């Protein structure tokens, strides 16, 4: 393309408020406009900056990528927490398997009153999901909070459909004693007397019987409330003892593991010490052989010097004689 092809008359020479120090010449050919920049005619389409919609698309893309990155980071942190919890549960399961393999456990012995209270109540406890306990868990009780933290330990036994083992403490089994037989017998007697009275009463004495029932109901309610609280205290005490015993056995397991690891480390240290001694002996042998070789090399060097020295002397004398003869 030559300069004659351009229409120089249509060149735009007007320039209001230039943004640069110099104004680049422009020429229009057909529907395209060229600008002279750095010694070249360049199409203005290639010199225009990016449009605003493109910038918006790029910003939206970066925002989406940033949100995805934040979600990935949150999921990663949650995964780390779940791994830690899984590790803790695995260690507890391992400790319980070790205790189960040892013949150190006995079964908890429940009294008749506690079994009756367990059967009467229909509220499940988080500690024993297969049994019915007659008390509610209060968040303020520290002992229950501690037992709740170790509830996963007890869930293992319920999954296996086995009774919860305890440990011989001072060669005696921890047994839940019966303390409310008198209260339960009083309840049974009162129930039997009321049933017999209902069977013997006639239609004429119905009003008197109703009055007697109203007078006896509060006493029966009081007798029902008292043994339930005592049973709850007994169950809480048994759970506290169980938790303490489990802690003791976990400590013993940790101590046994530490001892085993200590013995293993001692054996490894002994093995490495023996290997070190062997390597040291080999190093001394190598040093001795190297010193012998160096002494032999020195002796050979001296012998070579003794042999070659007279030969070099004769050759030097011959060269001196030839040089003298050549000068003459």
From Swiss-Prot:
Pfam family, one: Chibby
UniProt biased composition (Basic and acidic residues): 206-215
Keywords: Coiled coil
Disordered: annotated span: 180-231
Polar residues: compositionally biased ranges: 182-195
Domain of life assignment: Eukaryota
Family to which the UniProt record says this protein belongs: Belongs to the chibby family. SPERT subfamily.
Name of the featured protein: Protein chibby homolog 2
Organism lineage: Eukaryota, Metazoa, Chordata, Craniata, Vertebrata
């Amino acid at each position: 393309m030559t300069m004659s092809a351009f229409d120089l008359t249509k060149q735009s020479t007007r320039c209001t408020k230039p943004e640069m120090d110099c104004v680049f010449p422009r020429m229009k050919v057909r529907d395209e406009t060229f600008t002279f920049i750095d010694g070249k005619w360049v199409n203005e389409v290639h010199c225009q900056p990016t449009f605003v919609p493109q910038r918006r698309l790029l910003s939206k893309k970066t925002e989406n990528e940033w949100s995805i990155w934040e979600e990935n980071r949150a999921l990663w942190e949650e995964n780390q927490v779940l791994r830690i919890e899984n590790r803790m549960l695995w260690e507890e399961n391992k400790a319980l398997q070790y205790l189960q393999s040892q013949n150190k456990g006995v079964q908890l012995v429940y009294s008749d009153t506690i079994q009756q209270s367990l059967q009467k109540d229909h509220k499940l406890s988080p500690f024993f999901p297969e049994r019915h306990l007659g008390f509610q868990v209060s968040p303020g009780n520290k002992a229950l909070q501690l037992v709740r933290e170790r509830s996963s330990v007890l869930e293992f036994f319920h999954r296996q459909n086995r009774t919860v083992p305890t440990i011989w403490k001072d060669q005696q089994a921890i047994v839940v004693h019966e303390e409310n037989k008198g209260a339960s017998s009083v309840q049974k007697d009162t129930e039997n007397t009321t049933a017999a009275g209902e069977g013997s009463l006639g239609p004429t004495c119905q009003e008197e019987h109703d009055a007697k029932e109203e007078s006896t109901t509060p006493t029966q309610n009081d007798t029902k409330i008292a043994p339930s609280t005592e049973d709850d205290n007994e169950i809480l005490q048994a759970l506290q003892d169980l938790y303490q015993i489990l802690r003791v056995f976990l400590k013993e397991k940790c101590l046994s593991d530490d001892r085993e690891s200590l013995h293993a480390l001692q054996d490894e240290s002994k093995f490495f010490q023996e290997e070190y001694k062997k390597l040291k002996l080999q190093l001394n042998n190598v040093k001795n052989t190297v010193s012998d070789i160096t002494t032999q090399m020195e002796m050979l060097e001296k012998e070579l010097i003794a042999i070659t020295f007279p030969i070099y002397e004769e050759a030097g004398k011959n060269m001196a004689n030839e040089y003298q003869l050549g000068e003459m």
